[in-house]
Amino acid sequence: MTAAIAPALYRVLSPPRSEGGKAVAVFADAAGDLQARAAAAGAPLSVFVEAVDVGSVSLRVFTPTQEKGSSDSGALAALAFLQTQSELLDVVEVQMGGEIMPAQLCGGEWLLRQGDVGVTEVPALDLSPLGLGVRSVQIASASRPNLVIEVADLGALEAFSPDAEGIAAVNRATGTTGLVLYTPGGPDRAEVSFRAFGPLKGFLEDGASSNMFACLVGVLGAQGRLPTDLKMLRGAQRMPGAPARLTAQFTPAANGAADVWVGGRAERVSP
């Protein structure tokens, strides 16, 4: 396979009947100047398949300007692509950026393991820098600690205008790296709606964050608000102009959630 072959363009974690989610270009090989190929792909994220067999996949991930290391969205797009090209087991290992992450196929969607999520309460905290009313505040961690705040309703969630300095201030005050705002319910029968912010991580708002959704799953578990029948949760991420839909699989735990997997659909849009 040569570098001249065009990539397959996928839209990952997009809601039904929507142009949201993340655009990812998937290259079936990893030959030549990968940075130049990513720059010419016309997508904000490109993933290259270095190696694949029935039980493992090795990937490299690039933005148009630099190698990214790892990306859940990139992995989901690559797995969806490879599923159409070769035979994969329902559980595989994904190698990227020096990490190995288990993935599983569940109900036609690939999910990546985020691990166990622990939740702690937050002592008295000045949230005035955020400029919104809150119903509950916790810290949840799935490898990285995030401040997780419940707001009044979907209107308040969608009306929130993020201020990088204000969010960074409450993150520093709590020793967290990101902020998740959420409220129950959502479009297309989602059980919860949320937004994810991370000025201390180098971005203001992320439109589709698997790790931060996993933290939210942990908070709902600690509150006893997770579904008790299917052990699955649908989340509507509500970044203005770029909605996303994520699926989580979990095992309930007293102080959060165990064995959390997060993913969603990846749809090929071209060629």
Model-derived segments and spans:
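Active-site proximal loop and beta-alpha junction motif in alpha/beta enzyme cores
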Residues: 1-70, 75-271
